[in-house]
Design a protein with these regions (language model features):
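Conserved helicase motor core of P-loop NTPases
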Residues: 93-174
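Short, conserved "post-DEAD/DEAH" coupling segment immediately C-terminal to helicase motif II
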Residues: 71-85, 103-108
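Short glycine-/polar-rich loops that comprise or flank the Walker A/P-loop
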Residues: 8, 58, 83-86, 112-117, ...
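Conserved catalytic network of the ASCE P-loop NTPase/AAA+ motor domain
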Residues: 4-5, 53-55, 79-84, 109-113, ...
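Walker B catalytic acidic pair
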Residues: 64-66, 91
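Inter-Walker segment of RecA-like/P-loop motor cores
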Residues: 8-60
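Catalytic P-loop NTPase motifs of RecA-like helicase/translocase cores
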Residues: 39, 68-70, 96-97
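Conserved RecA-like ASCE P-loop NTPase motor core of nucleic-acid helicases/translocases
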Residues: 1-27, 88-90, 151-166, 170-174
């Protein structure tokens, strides 16, 4: 975008500080912000009908991890972007939906109202690893899974025992 539009403004956003920092690191752009910060929602004040909104001054806005965005935050975002601003929403519709109300990213993708591009290149896990392999099976509705060093099944009789075993495994790995 910077190469094509030297005078164009763009904004990088994500729902969490961790995701925005990772976005900044992976793009080499220093100014990736949380949605709350970029939208002026960090004051702790309730946002009512008469609020003074901070509009996003950008020609292009890219929001990563959009599957984590609930209905309220999505509404705040969409009412603060300009009519001619291009928006790219990045996320995984197969991840757990937002903690708050709504499965906004999934619904947008399946609405047929917005163009969708599916990226099938795996960045965070080994392409040949069992996590990616099993994720594909799970997304297809299959229960046949493969186990190995990077994908294990921990059987336990109770929730408390499950938590203890997970903690033990985590401490050994860390």
């Amino acid at each position: 975008f910077k190469n094509l539009h030297q005078k164009g403004k763009f904004a990088l956003m994500a729902p969490t500080g961790r995701a925005s920092r990772r976005m900044a690191e992976s793009t080499g752009v220093d100014e990736a912000r949380t949605l709350h910060s970029a939208l002026g929602l960090c004051t702790g004040e309730e946002v009512g009908d008469g609020e003074r909104v901070r509009f996003v001054d950008a020609d292009l806005v890219i929001v990563d991890e959009f599957s984590m965005v609930d209905m309220w935050l999505a509404q705040q975002f969409f009412k603060r972007i300009g009519q001619h601003t291009r928006v790219v929403l990045v996320g995984d519709p197969n991840q757990l939906p937002s903690v708050g109300a709504g499965n906004v990213f999934y619904e947008l993708i399946h609405s047929g109202m917005v163009p969708v591009t599916v990226l099938d290149w795996i960045f965070r896990q080994s392409k040949d690893g069992l996590i990616a392999y099993n994720a594909k099976f799970i997304n297809e509705g299959s229960t046949k899974l493969y186990y190995g060093n990077d994908f294990v099944f921990v059987d336990s009789p109770t929730q408390i025992e499950t938590a203890r075993r997970i903690q033990d495994i985590y401490c050994k790995e860390a």
